[in-house]
A protein has these predicted regions:
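Short alpha-helical elements
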Residues: 1-204
Length: 204
């Protein structure tokens, strides 16, 4: 097969310039932190967060670079606490909305049809928010996503334990999508929402 692959890659590392352009403006003045500034740059901390989200590993299993003394340059708990703080402040949602806004501004979104579907991700080594899916025969996390026709994710994932029915998750996902659409000025007039057959029945 020749030519470039059509699928999209998941970013696992940002350059400092990319971080300052796309992420830093959404972290807020002071980043919601009291006390001395972190010894490790926010850029490097953010890249560690991207890495653990991509790998799907436990935080304590995150590979961390060594400093000049041969010690980990940061403890994994500090990365985790930073991530949770940014979540609580709404920074992660703001970063996501900013990326969707950029896709819209660059005319890279096709909102004629919005696709919604769910999947179960395996978590063989444990983790948070897990449940056993009898249908999939695995223990993991249930995820529902909404995408445009180019497979751009245009609403934050809604997750639950793997044994949960997907229908209630869609009920939670649609308001979050509507919130982002209003925030960035999406024009959804005439848009068709296409859902997996599991959503045809009543919410259960």
């Amino acid at each position: 097969m020749t030519g470039n692959p059509c699928w999209q890659t998941i970013p696992t590392k940002l350059s400092e310039a990319q971080f300052e352009r796309f992420v830093l403006p959404h972290l807020g003045k002071g980043h919601g932190r009291r006390g001395p500034a972190p010894t490790l740059s926010l850029h490097r901390i953010f890249n560690y967060i991207l890495q653990v989200l991509y790998m799907g590993c436990q935080w304590k299993m995150l590979p961390i670079d060594r400093n000049a003394q041969g010690l980990p340059e940061i403890h994994y708990t500090r990365i985790y606490r930073t991530f949770r703080r940014w979540q609580a402040m709404g920074c992660i949602d703001a970063i996501f909305a900013g990326s969707v806004r950029r896709l819209r501004d660059d005319q890279l979104l096709d909102l004629t049809v919005i696709h919604g579907d769910g999947t179960t991700t395996a978590a063989k080594k444990g983790g948070d928010n897990l449940g056993y899916s009898g249908h999939k025969h695995l223990k993991g996390d249930k995820v529902v996503a909404l995408c445009d026709r180019h497979c751009n994710v245009i609403a934050p994932f809604v997750t639950a334990a793997g044994n949960r029915n997907e229908s209630p998750l869609l009920r939670d996902a649609l308001p979050r999508f509507s919130q982002i659409a209003r925030a960035i000025g999406m024009d959804l007039q005439g848009t068709i929402v296409s859902l997996d057959g599991v959503y045809d029945g009543s919410v259960g």
